[in-house]
Amino acid sequence: LSLYAVGILLSRASKMPGRDGDILARLTTLPQALADHAKKGILQAQFAQLPPVPQLARHLATLLGSFTFDWSILPESPRKTSLPLQMPLLTLHDANSEALLQQQLQTQWQTTWQQHFATAPWMMRNWLIYRVYHDVIGQTDGADYFPLVCDFYLLRTLISLWTLDGSSLRQEDIFALFAMFERWRASENALLVRQQIQSLCAADPLLSAFSLLT
C-alpha cells in the first residue's frame, strides 16, 4: 500500500505542470491528503480495485532465473546450496507453467509476510524508504518508480522462492538476501536485465508498476 501511495503521489504531481508558487503549494499538500485517505480507508479501497495484470509479474519471475547473484554473501544453510541450483530452471517455464508459478509465489509471499515481516515490517519498510529517498523523490514522470516497484517484486519473489520448499528463513538470511540483491543492482548483469525489463514495460510506467502491486 505504501508503494501504491507513492505511485499515486507521482501520478498527481505529473498532472500539475509548472513549478510556480501555487503548484508547489498544492504539491506539498498531497502527502497529507493521501494520509487522510488512508485513515478513512479510501486508499485501501482504491488499491483493492486495481485490476490484475499478471503478465509482467510472470515474466519477471522467469527472468529472475538469469540473474547472476553473489550467493557467497549468504550465511551457511542448506537453502544457500539448493536455491542457486534451482534458479536457472525458472528460465525454462512456458506460459502455462509461468502462470502456475506466479500463483504459487503470490500465495507463498502472503504466508512468508505473515510469518516473518508482519511483526517486523521495518525490515522491508527501511529498504523502501531508502530507495524512495535516493531514486524516486524529485521525479514526477514515474520513470524511476517503475524500476523501484520491479525491484520490490523481484526481491519478494526471491524471498518467496527461498521459503517455497518449506526452508526456514532466519533474520540473518533476510538481511543477507537484501545485501545480495543490492550488490546485484550495482552489477553489469543488472544493466542488461534492466534493458530486458524495459522492453516488457507498457507505454505508461506507472500503470506497469501498479500491475506488480496487485
Locations of regions flagged by a protein language model:
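Hydrophobic, aromatic-lined core segments that form the binding pocket/scaffold
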Residues: 2-214
